[in-house]
Amino acid sequence: MMMTEQQPFDLVRRYPGFDLRRYPSHTVAQIKVRASFDKAGNLAFRSLFGYISGQNRTNTSLAMTAPVVQAVTPEPVGRSSSAKDPGSQKVTMTAPVVQRPAGDDGFVVAFVLPASLTVDTAPVPTNPQVEIHTIPAGLAAAVSYSGGWSQSGFDKHSAQLHQAVLDAGLTLIGPPRFARFDPPFKPWFLRHNEVVQDVREPA
């Protein structure tokens, strides 16, 4: 399994300690899991990978896109899908996978879907726990690091990013997200990870 498409963004500026990026509106498949930070991604992966492997109303397989995202907001802001899907398709998975905390109920983990898909055209999941959402365009600070998917690693780089953003005179919005760009079988020391933090548009 390879993540053949990367989530697009425009590099606005490089600051000491982070990149400022502008992300376009994009579509995600997400699921909530009740687990620790370290276990949430692996628990969610099976259901989300099942969705892109054909567990949807059209039996469509999707290519995997990077990243997978795990982050800190109860719900994404944007539209969700209730559309009906007429037939079978093949879907690519995009990188990253995103993970964020979901209040006291664990974490939300999301696969970023290929840029060609919207909430109206993405296959409808057969698993009721998997939801399709549109995430609106926005400005974000991001820092990359290699290594495992531990909470300690995320917390360390999140704290560094937080301080760097404040030092740059920018305002943080909401909690940070954890973005994973590699499949679980890749050696931990070769994995590409990011912490992504929404920021307010400069005046």
Language-model segment annotations:
Residues 1-203:
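A solvent-exposed interaction/effector surface
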